[in-house]
Amino acid sequence: MNPLKSPLEGFLNILKPPGMTSHDVVAKARRILREKRIGHMGTLDPDAAGVLPIALGQATRLIELVRGDKSYRAQLLLGRITDSQDVSGRIVEEHPIPQLTRQAWEELLKEFQGLMEQIPPMVSAVSVGGKRLYEYARQGIEVERPSRKINIDRIDIVQYHEHAPGELILDVDCSGGTYIRTLCHDIGQRLGCGAIMGWLIRRRSGPFRLQNSCTLKELEQGLAPEKLVSPGEVLQHLPNMEINERRLPALKQGLAQFLPDKNWMEGQWIRMNYRGQLLAVGQAIWQDDRWLCQPRKVLQWSESILK
């Protein structure tokens, strides 16, 4: 049961095709669904394909709380450097390709796991000085970009042949905000021969997986309601508290709710459910020698949940 007022309140796991920008996908979904409030989670390059979750209606208020970790499959091509760090860019350097065994590759890739700093590419949506980096790049201007902390949990070789040493297929699990193009570039710099990203598929974004994605064609066929994922399902990683029915009016007014004794952390996000249905999300606060949950995002719900 959908506790929210509109039948299209929640998340859709869209399969973005190559050749469309993330903005194009959102614009097309908006036209198909006739829903003004739509937002996507995590920009995908135009040439990339894969999971692009979008939020509809009230769910757009919850985007910041959705898990941001990602999984990718990518093609790494050695011996070239381009101005965009991928195959679509202008070649600026070419170098001989080194011969490496699979074992040597596995040892090398261990250096690129864990916490590290990454400088985003010039052709990216990162803002510097109030402008997107790709806007500077279009004008032929290169600006200094601050590095960002990222985490690569796993990087595995899916395919490598020693008779074709210039290409690898990699699987990467990483934190949100990681640029796989830049990872490929940095691997090439480490080897001294340069490298770029070929194709890229996002296989997972938070709880959204490639095998459960839906196409824009399916949206055109009217299948959105059955593909919709509820906010409660998407926020399963957050701890939960059940609201007593007599406290529902107070919740609607945004009043704090008493939390059972637990080792809460100040500011910790909590799902606020009634009969298993998400009605709000709040944060733990310590007040008057007890823990309370202060609602921060109260959703508009249908009175049918009381029946």
Curated annotation (Swiss-Prot):
Gene3D superfamilies: Pseudouridine synthase. The keyword NAD does not apply. Keywords: Isomerase, tRNA processing. One of its GO terms (biological process) is tRNA modification. Its EC number is 5.4.99.25. One of its GO terms (molecular function) is tRNA pseudouridine(55) synthase activity. It holds the Pfam family TruB_C_2. The keyword Nucleotide-binding does not apply. It catalyses: uridine(55) in tRNA = pseudouridine(55) in tRNA. The active site is at D45 (nucleophile). NCBIfam families: TruB (TIGR00431). Belongs to the pseudouridine synthase TruB family. Type 1 subfamily. Responsible for synthesis of pseudouridine from uracil-55 in the psi GC loop of transfer RNAs. HAMAP family: TruB_bact (MF_01080). This is tRNA pseudouridine synthase B. It comes from Heliobacterium mobile.
